[in-house]
């Protein structure tokens, strides 16, 4: 299978070494009966996000659909929306935009591309919150990432892990052991520190890992060092839950 990923979570490699990547991950639970229309709604927003990226307001946007078999068939969200920013300043600038700015910008993004009736329809659906039953947001500060190269592709499968740090050795294990272990085995891997979250977010998690496996990767070498490092590395963290997700829409720099 052809290696597929990653500039995807966002053309990270082109960023300045001094830039601190920030992502906002929104865990969305849909209102009953809206499932069939939701992805078309996000496609409308994809046009807006494409202009935002072109205008330098953000660096990436990804919509991941959650596999309903995740978390023993009881996933805590239906979709993940990931907005990527080159730094904290860029993120805060967007978060401070008033509603009127967004309404005007949506119209500008779709001018000459969509009928006025369609723009009005999706603008109203946005303002009236037609689709979201529940929305939980985490603000993440990138610690490290690893790319196996390639490009995003619809249907790409990724795994989203909520992590609790258990002791002071956790990040060292992630960066000095697990990251090295993933080389040649992951199309993408990232570890983030949760710097903020919405009031309704899950409190125990401190970090988030997102990864995309390489199905053609060689088997992990079984030896004493790897076994012991994995054993003790796992004592530094607790995985509170994992969502299997599929990429359905994206825009990136």
Please place each PLM-identified region on the residue numbering.
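Bacterial Sec-dependent N-terminal signal peptides
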Residues: 1-22
